[in-house]
UniProtKB/Swiss-Prot annotation:
This is Thiol:disulfide interchange protein DsbE. Keywords: Cell inner membrane, Cell membrane, Cytochrome c-type biogenesis, Disulfide bond, Membrane, Redox-active center, Transmembrane, Transmembrane helix. GO terms for molecular function: disulfide oxidoreductase activity. GO terms for biological process: cytochrome complex assembly. CDD domains: TlpA_like_DsbE. Gene3D superfamilies: Glutaredoxin. Belongs to the thioredoxin family. DsbE subfamily. Disulfide bonds join 73-76. It holds the Pfam family Redoxin. It is found in: Cell inner membrane. The gene is dsbE.
């Protein structure tokens, strides 16, 4: 009987260890977002420039990318020139400045240019939390009704845009046409 009492905890420990070990190799970019198919979460936040307050209603009307970024994010610095080029080509991009110092964000946008039609300031990270953001950069695709249709985790470079994301964005644009 005592031998059985020793085997059960050992078996449970090994089972937990296997699950934890397996979890180390899961790619967060491969995890589906719980927000896909749901309306963009409610929020009431200032712009980075502080000139007005935005809500989720401001994101409705046209398909867009919603890019989560921060000045402390090295990958965001790599991605930013590509976002500028996309904005110049007419891609609608909204930005969420995530858990960042607002003065640093203003300096960043002045120095590297602002690809965002709307720039939401999420200093405390609550909007990011409601979106299920793991870090930055993350980009959500929203339709004209403000529903999240897809999510991309990681740097959007020209190859990723061309090979993976451009068609998804164009499908949302085509869907919004009358």
């Amino acid at each position: 009987m005592k031998r059985w009492l020793m085997v059960v905890p050992l078996a449970l420990f090994l089972l937990v260890a296997v699950f934890l070990y397996r979890g180390l190799y899961l790619d967060p970019a491969e995890l589906p977002s719980r927000m896909i198919g749901k309306p963009f979460p409610a929020f009431n936040l200032p712009t980075v420039h502080g000139d007005k307050t935005l809500t989720q209603a401001d994101l409705r009307g046209k398909p867009a990318l919603v890019n989560v970024w921060a000045t402390w994010c090295i990958s965001c610095r790599v991605e930013h020139p590509v976002l500028n080029k996309l904005a110049e080509k007419g891609v609608v991009i909204y930005g969420i400045n995530y858990k960042d110092d607002n003065a640093a964000a203003l300096k960043w946008l002045a120095e590297f240019h602002n690809p965002y039609q709307l720039d939401i300031r999420d200093e405390d990270g609550n909007l990011g939390l409601n979106l299920g953001v793991y870090g930055a950069p993350e980009t959500f695709f929203i339709d004209a009704k403000g529903v999240i249709r897809d999510k991309y985790v990681g740097v959007i470079d020209e190859v990723v845009w061309r090979d993976e994301l451009a068609a998804k964005y164009q499908a949302l644009v085509d869907e919004a046409k009358p």
